[in-house]
């Protein structure tokens, strides 16, 4: 491995997250390799990154006042999702059920959490449980954006309903990363899907399989939901309207889970509000529907299912735009992501010579 891995790499890095990470992102042409790159630990995979998919969590944790620097380290490279090629693997402890990954194999996946050595770099170290082979026929660049949102959508729907066929699911926010995958996954499971989006994205959501689309620019979302048959599951990808959860008893069946995926910002008020939703008794003013903030766990079998659906043409990544590594590509990519107006996913191509 020593002969194939350079001593330095190109990586986008930031040393301050104030006021935003993109305001401080710089391309370092001589960044150090991730710690342990030449001496991999158990169940680690060194990946040469071809493309990285962006997610709001990339900057939301880093930008938490005071704590962000300690969570991700400094200087830091953002990014959790990737598609790339295996360079080397560490000892396999069999702690997770994975196939043997071979050097040269094309893979996609995600890191466990935002960290100092993210995926907006030429090399990253992924856990084996978060790294699986790209199925034949899949577009490599598109798989770079699948892991986080695909897994979130899959686990928020498949894990939360015992019987899926005919169940009514409301996805709040259908045109972003989690929403576009969520619509397709819920339909694969046989659910009836209602979602919300703005006027320009109505046709997109319908094309992905949504049965009913609420245009929040033209009507009140909660008022429309109250007119419909009760739902069995709510997945909130955006966090607005802010009173959506508190109104849930008026448009959901008793016991229907409410899964919080997205939020405008991680603030003290947001954290306190979530405590009341999750822990405070309903008779004392707390939540009257089971509420949880979505936490995903990398699972090889789930990634492989997503890959099979993509291979079979049953699941597609909706890509808003692909940026390059050079010319402030990462800066522009995060600026667009932060607007909240992207249709689907935003990708940064790390290896600009790669063509699917």
UniProtKB/Swiss-Prot annotation:
Alphabetized, the UniProt keywords read: NADP, Nucleotide-binding, Oxidoreductase
Q: Domain of life, per the record?
A: Eukaryota
Q: What happens when the gene is disrupted?
A: Does not affect the production of the naphthoquinones derived pigments.
Give one Pfam family, short name only. Answer: ADH_zinc_N_2
Positions of NADP(+) binding: 57-60, 175-178, 198-201, 216, 261-262, 342-343
What is the main EC category here? oxidoreductase
Q: Induction: what does the entry report?
A: Expression is significantly up-regulated at the end of late growth phase, in the presence of Butyrolactone I. Expression is positively regulated by the pgm cluster-specific transcription factor pgmR.
Q: Which InterPro entries match?
A: ADH-like_N, GroES-like_sf, NAD(P)-bd_dom_sf, PKS_ER, YIM1/Zinc_Alcohol_DH_Fams
Give the CC-aspect GO terms.
Answer: mitochondrion
List the Gene Ontology MF annotations in alphabetical order: nucleotide binding; oxidoreductase activity
| Entry's EC annotation | 1.-.-.-
Residues folding into a coiled coil are: none
Instruction: Check the record and name the CDD domains matching this protein.
Output: MDR1 (cd08267)
The record's SMART domains line, in alphabetical order, gives:
PKS_ER
User: What does this protein's UniProt record list under function?
Assistant: FAD-linked oxidoreductase; part of the gene cluster that mediates the biosynthesis of pleosporalin A, ascomycone A, as well as a third cryptic naphthoquinone derived pigment, all responsible for the coloration of conidia. The pathway begins with the biosynthesis of the cyclized heptaketide 3-acetonyl-1,6,8-trihydroxy-2-naphthaldehyde by the NR-PKS pgmA.
Give the similarity note: Belongs to the zinc-containing alcohol dehydrogenase family.
Protein's recorded name: Trans-enoyl reductase pgmF
Q: Which organism is it from?
A: Aspergillus terreus (strain NIH 2624 / FGSC A1156)
The gene name reads: pgmF
């Amino acid at each position: 491995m020593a002969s194939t891995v350079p001593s330095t790499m190109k990586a986008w890095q930031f040393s301050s997250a104030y006021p935003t990470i993109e305001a401080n992102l710089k391309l370092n042409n001589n960044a150090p390799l991730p710690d342990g790159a030449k001496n991999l630990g158990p169940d680690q995979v060194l990946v040469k990154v071809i493309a990285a998919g962006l997610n709001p969590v990339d900057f939301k944790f880093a930008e938490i006042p005071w704590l962000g620097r300690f969570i991700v380290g400094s200087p830091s490279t953002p990014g959790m999702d990737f598609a790339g090629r295996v360079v080397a693997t560490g000892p396999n402890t069999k702690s997770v059920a994975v196939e043997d990954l071979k050097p040269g194999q094309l893979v996609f996946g995600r890191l466990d959490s935002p960290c100092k050595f993210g995926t907006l770099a030429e090399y990253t170290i992924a856990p084996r449980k978060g790294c699986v082979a790209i199925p034949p026929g899949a577009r490599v660049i598109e798989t770079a954006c699948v892991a986080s949102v695909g897994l979130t959508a899959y686990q928020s729907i498949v894990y939360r309903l015992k019987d899926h066929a005919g169940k009514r699911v409301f996805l709040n926010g259908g045109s972003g990363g989690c929403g576009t995958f969520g619509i397709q996954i819920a339909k694969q499971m046989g659910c009836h899907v209602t979602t919300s989006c703005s006027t320009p994205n109505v046709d997109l959501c319908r094309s992905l399989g949504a049965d009913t689309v609420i245009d929040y620019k033209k009507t009140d979302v909660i008022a429309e939901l109250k007119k419909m048959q009760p739902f069995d599951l709510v997945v909130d990808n955006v966090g607005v309207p802010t009173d959506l959860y508190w109104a849930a008893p008026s448009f959901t069946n008793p016991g229907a889970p409410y899964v919080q995926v997205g939020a405008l910002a991680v603030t003290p008020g947001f954290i306190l509000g979530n405590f009341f939703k999750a822990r405070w008794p309903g008779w004392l003013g707390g939540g009257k529907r089971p509420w949880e903030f979505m936490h995903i766990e990398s699972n090889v079998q789930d990634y492989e299912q997503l890959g099979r659906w993509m291979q079979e043409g049953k699941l597609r990544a909706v890509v808003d735009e692909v940026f390059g590594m050079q010319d402030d590509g990462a800066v522009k990519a995060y600026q667009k992501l932060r607007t909240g107006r992207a249709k689907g996913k935003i990708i940064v191509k790390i290896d600009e010579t790669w063509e699917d």
